[in-house]
Amino acid sequence: MIGRGTTDMKGFLACVLAQARRCRDMSPAKPFMIALSWDEEIGCRGIPYMVDQVVPFLGCPDIVIVGEPTEMQLCLGHKGKVSYKAICYGEAGHSALAPHFKNALHVAAKFILETSDLQLKLAKSGARDDAYTVPYSTVHAGIARGGVALNIVPERAEVSFEIRHLTTEEPANILNELDTNSENMKISTVYQYPGLSTNEADPVWKSLQALTNVPGPIKVAFGTEAGFFAKIGLRTVVIGPGSMASDGHQPDEGIDIDQLRKCNDFCGKLQHGLQSVLRLN
C-alpha cells in the first residue's frame, strides 16, 4: 500500500482504530484507550502537553504501546535527542578586504569540524550499547546557512545540529565537550525528547513478545514519544508495522499488506490476552 505516512505511522493507527471498533462489543476490565498526539515529526511538540493529562483524565494504563515501524518486533529502547541551533557572528565588509573582517562562515565551519571531531571521540571512547545499530551517542550537524552575496563577508551564519544520546549519557555533558563559550557564537535548544530504556527483566515483555510471532526484543535508532510515557512511570513499549529503514520517510512511502495483517492480528490478540499477560507481573 503506497501513501505518505502509511509506515510512519498511520498503518499502526488504522489497526488500532479497527480494534477499537471491535471493542464496542466487548466489556474489558479496563478501557482500550487511544492517545493521538500532533507534530511528532517536527520535534515531539504535542506530546508534552498531553502526557501529564493521561493519568488524571484516563486513569493509569497497564501498558502504553507507542506505534512506530518496528516490523512488529517488540522495541524496548531508543536514544534520546536534543536539537540545537548555533548562531555564529562575524563582521560585514567588502570581500576585497576580507582579511580585515571576521567571517561568520569561518566560525561556523570551525564549529562543524568540532562536532565531527567529537563524534569520532564518542565512537572511540564513549558509552556503548551494542543493541543499537550505532552503539554510541552521536553528534550530527545537518544544516548550515550564511552569507548574502559572494562579495560580502558574512556577518551571521547558522548551524543546526543534534545530539542523539544513549540513556546512560546526559546530552548536556556531551554538549560541554564542544567550545560553546565563544563570544562569536550563541547556542540555543530547539527541541528535545527523552530516550527509552525499558526494564527488560519485566516478565510482561516475554508474554507480549509471544503475541507477535517475530524475533525480538530490539532497540531502534530513531526516536519516538515512548520516553515521555516512561518518564512518568508508565510501562511503555514501542511496536508497529513497517520498516523505518526501507519504507519510512521515503519519496514513495508504502507498507507491505502482510505487515498490516500482522499488526491487526497482534491488536486482536492483545485485547483478548492482555489480562493473562499482566497477571505475570
Q: Which residue ranges define each predicted feature?
A:
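Acidic active-site catalytic centers that drive phospho-/nucleotidyl reactions
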Residues: 8, 40-41, 68, 162, ...
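Acidic/histidine-rich catalytic neighborhood of metal-dependent amide-processing enzymes
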Residues: 9, 13-83
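Short, basic/glycine-rich phosphate-binding loops at helix/coil junctions
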Residues: 1, 31, 186-188
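Conserved Rossmann-like nucleotide-binding pocket used by diverse enzymes
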Residues: 2, 65, 140
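Metal-dependent amide/peptide-bond hydrolase catalytic core
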Residues: 76, 83-281
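Glycine/serine-rich anion-binding loops at beta->alpha junctions
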Residues: 1-15, 94
